[in-house]
Amino acid sequence: MGLTDITALTSRIQELEKENSRLRAILDKNGISYTFKDNNLQENAVPAPVVTYSLEEKVAIFQGLFQGRSDVFAKRWYSETSKKSGYQPVCEREWNPDFCDKRKYKCADCPNRQFAPLSYSHLFNHLAGKDKWGRDVIGLYPIRKDNTCCFLCADFDDKSCEHGYKNDVLAFVNVCKAWKVPCYIERSRSGNGAHVWIFFQTPIPASKARKLGNTILTEAMNKEMRLSFKSYDRFFPNQDTLPEGGLGNLVALPLQGMVRRQGNSVFVDEHFNAFSNQWNVLANIQKMSQADIDLLLQKHIAPSLGNLSTTSDAKPWETPDAELIEASDFPKQIALTRANMLYIPLTGLSARCVNAFKRIAAFRNPEFYERQGMRLSTYNVPRIISCSELSDHYLALPRGCEDAVSDILSRHAVNTSISDKTNHGRSISVTFKGELREEQQMAMDAMIAHRTGTLSATTAFGKTVFAIAMIAQRKVNTLILVHNKALLAQWNERLEQFLGIDEAIDKPHGNRGRKKDSSTIGCLYSGKNTLHGIIDIALIQSCLNEGEAKPFVKQYGMVIVDECHHVSSVSFEQVLRQVTATYVYGLTATPIRKDGHQPIIFMQCGKIRFASKAKDQIVKQTFNRVLVPRFTTYRNITDDTKTYTQLTQALSEDSARNEFIIDDIKSALENRRTPLVLTTRTAHVRTLAQMLLPFADHVVQLVGADSNKEKRIALQKLQAIPQTESLAIVATGKYIGEGFDYPRLDTLFLTMPIAWKGNIEQYSGRLHREYDGKSEVQIYDYIDFHVPLCDSIYRKRLKL
C-alpha cells in the first residue's frame, strides 16, 4: 500500500464519517433510535487487520493525526551540566553568526528570529529517537493561526493528581465511553503520568475543544472524588485563543523513539498495558465530528466548569447550589468536626456529593480570564482557585463554608452532629468605656449572634470602636490581626481609650533588675514581642515563620481581622487556616477585591452579617459632599500608547499640570481648608510638597518608603499641629488608604487617574470623620481628557 493510497483512504474515511454524523443528527432530531458499536479504546471492537507500514507511511499517519501549527514547532533541549530540560521553538538562524547573538539577545527577544517549519525529517527523527538525551523530541503548538485545533489532549500526572494518575485517567475515560467520545490513552514520557487524546475530523475552535474537555472533566469529578481542580489547567490547548504575540502552550508528541523503547510515550489500554502494534492503533483512530461535539455540548448544558462559588457587589458571600445531589448520595447521619477548618468525614458520601462540597470552597480566578481576554499568556495562572483540602478520611473546608454545608445536609434530611474542637479561650475581665451609636448596636446584634462573620462598613462607621465593644461582650482572650504598623498603633491607642482591662500580668525585668512598665495590651511586630495572651495585636507578617503560622495563633478564643480584605493574600490565609478560635470576625470597608479573590475573605471570616453603605452614612453625617472635576490641558504629544506607569510618571513631571494643581491647593488653604493631596508616585509627593511650602504653615509628607522613625515623627508632628495653623498633607495613596485617621481633613486632591472602586472609597473615607466646624468636604478630581487612557479611567470613576 503506497503513500498515495493511504492519503486517499484517509480522505474517504473522513467523508464517510461526516456523512454518518449528519445522518445521526437527523435521527436524533426526530427521536429515532439507532445503535452502533462503541469502539472507544477498541473495546468490543473487531480488531483491525494488522498491516505493515513503511517508514514513509508511518510518518504520514503520524502527521495526519497530530496536526497543529506547521510553520513553527519546538524541540526538547537538555543541559548535561545542570540536568535541566525544556522546549523552545526551532529557529532556522540559530548559531548563524550573521543573525544569532546569544550574548545580546535571549531567543524569545531576538529580532532576527525566523521559525523553522515542521518537516518530514523532524518527524522521522522524533520517531527514531537517536539522541540519547531526547533532544530530537518534538513539541507541537496545538492552536493554529485561526484559533482552531485538530485534537484535545488531557494531561494527568502524579504531581497534579492527589491519589495517583491512573484513577483520574480512568474517571475521565469512563465519561468519554459513556458519552460515545472516542479517546486514546498515552503513557507519558516519564512513565508517571498519561495523556488522553481526542481527535477531530476537521479543525474546530479551540474554545469549543476546551469546553468539551471541561464538560467531560466536570462529570468525571462527580464520579471520582479525588480529581483535582488543577486538571482544568492541564488541557492542550490550554487557551481559547492565541496570546498576543505568542504561540500558546505546546504538547510533546507521543511515540518518542528513545523512551518508546523503554515502554513510555506509547498508547496503552485501560489496564495501562501497551498495545503490541502502535501503528495499527494510530491507523484506525476514530475522530469526532464537529456535529457530534455540538450535540454533546447541547445535551450537557450545565456550566462546563461546574457550579462554583460566585460573588457580586450585592451578595459577595454567595455560594453555589448543590447540583443533582440525591438523598442516596449521603449517609443517614454524619458527624462534622469544627476546628481550624470544618472537617467532613468521607464515609458514606458519594463522589458527586464530595465534589459539590469541594465546589463550595472554589471559585473562578478572575486573573486568568482577564489575561485570556487581553490575549496575554496564562501560563501558571489557574482557572479555578480551591481552598479545600482532601485527606484519606476527611474533606476539610474553610470555617466560613459551614452554613452552606449545613444547608445542603438539612435539605437532604441528613441527621447532623458537630463536634466542636475550637479553642474557647480563657475568660478575661474587660469592660467597654464607650457608648455605641444606634447603627453600631444593630451591627453588634447581628454579629454577636454568630461565631463567625464579616462587618462591611464605611470608614466613618467606627469599626475599631465597635470591635472593642465586641471584645467586652465576648470576654475571651483575643488576638487582633493587622497588616501594617499604623493600624497596630491605632488599635493600641483605641484599646487604651475604650477598653478597661482588669487583668494582672507578670512585668518583665530590665537589665538592672527593675520591673519595666508594661501594658496589658500585647503587641507583636518586627523587633518587639510583648504578647500576654489577654488582648494582643499582631502584625500578620510576624505571625509567620518560614511560611508557617506560629503556634501562638491557636491560643485565643477570639480572633479579629482588621481590613480583612487582605485575607486573600497568601500570608493572611496561611495564618487564618491555622487559627482554632471559636470566634473569628473580619472588619472591612471594601469587601470586593480588585483581583476578585473576595470569596476567600468570607471562607475564612464568615459571610457578611451586617453592611453599612456610604449612602447610609451620608444621611447621618453633618456635612455636605462636593465633587470638583478639574480638566487639565495636558497632552501626550509623543505617544498615546504608554503604559499606566509610564503615563503617571509623565503626568508627575509636567510642570504646567503641577502648577495647575498647586493653584487649587493654595486656594483651599486660603479658605482655611485642610487638604490631603494624593498621588501614586513618591517623587511626585516630594515635588508637590516642595511647591506647597510657601503657602502653608505645615506641609507633611507621608510615603511608604520612609523609615519607621520618619513615619513616627511625621505622625507625631500631625498630632501637635494646632487647629489655628494651616496644614497640607501630601501622601501616596497606598500609605494613606488604610489605618490613617485624621478627622481635620476636609479636602481631597486626586492628582493621578484611578478607577478601582475600593481605592475611591478608601481615599474619600479619609474626609468623612466628624470634626468640629466641618460643614463641607470637597474632592478635586483631575481629568486629563486629552489622553485616551485617562479619559477612559475618568468615565469608570463616574460609574462608581
Q: Where are the model-predicted features located?
A:
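DNA replication initiation modules
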Residues: V137-L170, Q201-W317
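Post-DEXD/H (motif II) to motif III coupling segment of the RecA-like Helicase ATP-binding lobe
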Residues: G557-M558, H565-V626
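Conserved Walker A/P-loop ATP-binding site and its immediately adjacent core
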Residues: V465-Q497, R681-A683
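Conserved interdomain hinge at the start of the Helicase C-terminal
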Residues: D639-T680, T687-M691
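Conserved helix-turn-beta segment of the N-terminal RecA-like "Helicase ATP-binding" lobe
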Residues: L487-C523, G527
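Conserved SF2 helicase motif VI
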Residues: P591, A755-S775, I779
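Conserved helicase ATPase core of P-loop NTP-dependent helicases/translocases
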Residues: K528-L531, T687, D697-K734
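Signature for HUH/AEP ssDNA processing cores
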Residues: G2, T10, P49-N192, F199-K211, ...
